[in-house]
Amino acid sequence: MSKTEKNALDLLKGAYNLITPDDNKKYYEGFAPFYDSVFVKDLGYTYPTVVANLLVEKFTIDGPICDIGCGTGLVANEIKKKAPNAVIDGVDISQDMIQISREKKLYRNLLELNLEDHLDSLLQDYSAVVSAGTFTHGHLGSETLKRLISHFNSGTKFVIGINFDHYHSKGFEKQFKALNETNIIDCFELNEVKVYNKDNKNLNIKNGKACVCLFSKT
């Protein structure tokens, strides 16, 4: 394992200890400057590419897209490769990550927001909502996702990535079943994907898979 891979892994381990919104802000304050160069490059973090491709390939997007937990703009960058004219707004809890996104000029608007707070400042009228990495570390649960889904207008399409273990152990699977059975969402599709394109066994990465959920709000 290279030194840069080890540094990236040390940072990744820290992410799974995040509990409060302040924990997240402090963590990404230190992570933001080299998130792309170390974490993405050295660990082969391809999750944003997978999520963006599913959005573009599975849905017809005829309006603005909301990128929840936009970070440094990795998902938006991949969407723009296939849909250069896409209009994307980004939402993230970390002002430091948002600043890097802003410099890339990928987004129409960028909003600093804690998803556990009121969502009044978040627009409701989006063609699609996409997220890769927000529901990963366990601090945001299925009830937060349910509240987020309810915020957006009927007809909104969703591509939401969730940590594989947490999907099954922290109530997401049951939540989606309930949402589907009560006709709050429809056209539900589950995709199990790899988060990294490198050998997770050699890198000793936990949680190397994710469940990407595609659905529409009725």
Say what each PLM segment does:
Residues M1-F34:
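N-terminal, positively charged/glycine-rich alpha-helical extensions of SAM-dependent methyltransferases
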Residues A32-T46:
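Class I SAM-dependent methyltransferase Rossmann-like catalytic core
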Residues G44-D62:
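Conserved alpha-helix/loop element of class I SAM-dependent methyltransferases that forms part
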Residues C66-L119:
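Class I SAM-dependent methyltransferase SAM/SAH-binding core
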Residues E116, S127-G141:
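A short SAM/SAH-binding and catalytic strip from SAM-dependent methyltransferases
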Residues E143-S154:
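A short glycine-rich, Lys/Arg-flanked "PGG" loop and its adjoining helix->strand segment in the class I
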Residues G155-F164:
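Conserved beta-strand signature within the Rossmann-like core of class I S-adenosyl-L-methionine
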Residues I184-T218:
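Class I S-adenosyl-L-methionine
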